[in-house]
């Protein structure tokens, strides 16, 4: 019998619990659900494992408060940290979540040095940078969940605008996972037809697309304002699963993620959202798109915003 991959989830809140459920339904591997809150990961693990029996998933799920249980993990997904509340930006979380991420990184360094690490905790681009520097893991094995989620929101709004299936929509959102993200209309298509061409055909307007871009940038904030007591978790979890699956199954999918750049896009020593190929080695390649002058200005503005936050924690 082939041994199941070991997947550790650091943080057992809404995203962590949803991740565990999705992993069990997809039968991607055995799960360790970690949290500092006693009883929470154990209770959720038991509940999800009972649900997994209905799905016919023969996997093990262990809830724990002990980091030693993540030892030998093939992949680790990190959601630990304070979530956003109404009126807060992702950046407002930086101080407390940096300390949490440093602690998580030290334990991954101790117990799971060979793992592929996906960071979800906000502010994303800064937290994944902290993870890399504190853990000492290779940069191709540490990425952040950003563009997959942002693109999924952009895809939904475009599908609604053009009244087509979301399966027909492909989009790319570059930059930091925040208000300065850069949805690339020129690289976004409906069944291969670029959005600017569809606008010329009279199927939409520049004004409507601009509204969609603004809504995409505020996609997380819109959900926070509606929930009032937390932030999005279904779509972030589904986005991380797409990244995890590409790694575990060596799918070599092109996904937009927060990746460590070393000169690509003229960016050095920084995590920023760009298209990458994910396979069994982790990040196989950064896809460097040719940007127009206007797109480059927006992208550079997003980079500057991330740099300022990095400087603030150093």
From Swiss-Prot:
Source organism, top-level taxon: Bacteria
Q: Which InterPro entries match?
A: L-lactate/malate_DH, Lactate/malate_DH_C, Lactate/malate_DH_N, Lactate_DH/Glyco_Ohase_4_C, Malate_DH_type3, NAD(P)-bd_dom_sf
Give the EC number(s) under which this enzyme is classified. Answer: 1.1.1.37
Reactions that this protein is recorded to catalyse? (S)-malate + NAD(+) = oxaloacetate + NADH + H(+)
Question: Does the UniProt entry include the keyword Electron transport?
Answer: no
Q: Active site at which residues?
A: 177
Listed binding positions for substrate are: 84, 90, 122, 153
Which molecular function terms from Gene Ontology are attached? L-lactate dehydrogenase activity; L-malate dehydrogenase (NAD+) activity
* Sequence positions that bind NAD(+): 11-16, 35, 97, 120-122
Identify the keywords attached in UniProt to this record, alphabetized. NAD, Oxidoreductase, Tricarboxylic acid cycle
GO BP annotations, alphabetical order? lactate metabolic process; tricarboxylic acid cycle
What functional role does this protein have? Catalyzes the reversible oxidation of malate to oxaloacetate.
Protein family per UniProt: Belongs to the LDH/MDH superfamily. MDH type 3 family.
Q: What is this protein called?
A: Malate dehydrogenase
Q: Which organism is it from?
A: Rickettsia typhi (strain ATCC VR-144 / Wilmington)
